[in-house]
Amino acid sequence: MQVSVETTQGLGRRVTITIAADSIETAVKSELVNVAKKVRIDGFRKGKVPMNIVAQRYGASVRQDVLGDLMSRNFIDAIIKEKINPAGAPTYVPGEYKLGEDFTYSVEFEVYPEVELQGLEAIEVEKPIVEVTDADVDGMLDTLRKQQATWKEKDGAVEAEDRVTIDFTGSVDGEEFEGGKASDFVLAMGQGRMIPGFEDGIKGHKAGEEFTIDVTFPEEYHAENLKGKAAKFAINLKKVEERELPELTAEFIKRFGVEDGSVEGLRAEVRKNMERELKSAIRNRVKSQAIEGLVKANDIDVPAALIDSEIDVLRRQAAQRFGGNEKQALELPRELFEEQAKRRVVVGLLLGEVIRTNELKADEERVKGLIEEMASAYEDPKEVIEFYSKNKELMDNMRNVALEEQAVEAVLAKAKVTEKETTFNELMNQQA
């Protein structure tokens, strides 16, 4: 076997391989012997068919199969010998084959980039320092009560957190516009669903009143014909409701899995959940900064084959989220996923190099801790932990998560990490 390697462009490579004629003939004869042992031909017992008849009937197809097998095996031998690491599936380009002559073919593919990590010491990471306070727990309890609230009709004026039922008709320069009219429209105040000024114009009014409010559509409004336009809305305020929060009774508290129904038990459960969310949020914030710094400090070439493969993964994930099938997934435009796919490949290559240079292996204690942390959010953590322990694929996925965390920590060990005190709500709002 003769081998030559050339660079085509960037990460592209072409390996040209020549297989000696006698190697081909030896492989063909060997395969014909195997075929002769299995075939049945009228007039001959199984395994007793003369070789010249076997060759006459099956020689062409056997030779084709043998050439395909030799091309594959010789390519693998060549890249091992040349220490080449292909990225993605190779493309085989066969030359002209003539019986009794050497056979030359080429294989085109991309290789993984050579990554030399740099700039780790210049990466800046700000780590949030946060404590879950009693006031934070109080706020979360209020949120839980609001989620379970009922609505009661009232006679008074509309306030910031009320709910209203309205008819409205919008117009610009005296002309009604498409989508600007609704009847019995239910609007929960304070959620920012409407354009600026709309809710403010309703506050202070009472049920039964009809009035007009003046607003201006934002410049970034989605409808081109309304961007930046002054508009009037004729409002018929039909009903005003106020929120009635449930009391923290034992019955209410037990809905959240607190068996003793006590306020203290609910506060403890809420605090535990908030601290788990907080730990995850801090970890994600630090990780995202470390990875962003790593990407900015290391500009690397990316094999197109890996990007294509990642685009296929993202397409299928998108189709699954929206209930589509594989055919519909492949019809989604690649432009929707190209940037995200490239970044995921870059991050994977860089973290892979961090893992390689630091000789990292998944810490089994960390894996165990991650599973326990994840399981604590479920009603029966022990059942979840046992389920994971018996599923090799899930365990391998969790080992990959642990290994990625270890790689990020290796980056952080060299980066400039500063601490900044903040509040639970500030951090969570930034995560949203």
Curated annotation (Swiss-Prot):
**Region Ribosome-binding, annotated ranges:** 1-112
Among InterPro entries, the record links this protein to: PPIase_dom_sf, PPIase_FKBP_dom, Trig_fac, Trigger_fac_C, Trigger_fac_C_sf, Trigger_fac_ribosome-bd_bac, Trigger_fac_ribosome-bd_sf, Trigger_fact/SurA_dom_sf
Keywords attached to this Swiss-Prot or TrEMBL record, sorted alphabetically, are: ADP-ribosylation, Cell cycle, Cell division, Chaperone, Cytoplasm, Isomerase, Rotamase
Phenotypic consequence of gene deletion = Non-essential; synthetic lethality is seen in a triple tig-dnaK-dnaJ disruption, although this depends on temperature (triple disruptions grow slowly at 20 and 34 degrees Celsius but not at all at 43 degrees) and strain background.
The biological process GO terms on file are:
'de novo' cotranslational protein folding; cell division; chaperone-mediated protein folding; protein transport; protein unfolding; response to heat; stress response to copper ion
**One Pfam family recorded for the sequence:** Trigger_N
ADP-ribosylarginine PTM positions read 45
What protein does this entry describe? Trigger factor
- Specify the species: Escherichia coli (strain K12)
Q: What is the lineage of its organism?
A: Bacteria, Pseudomonadati, Pseudomonadota, Gammaproteobacteria, Enterobacterales
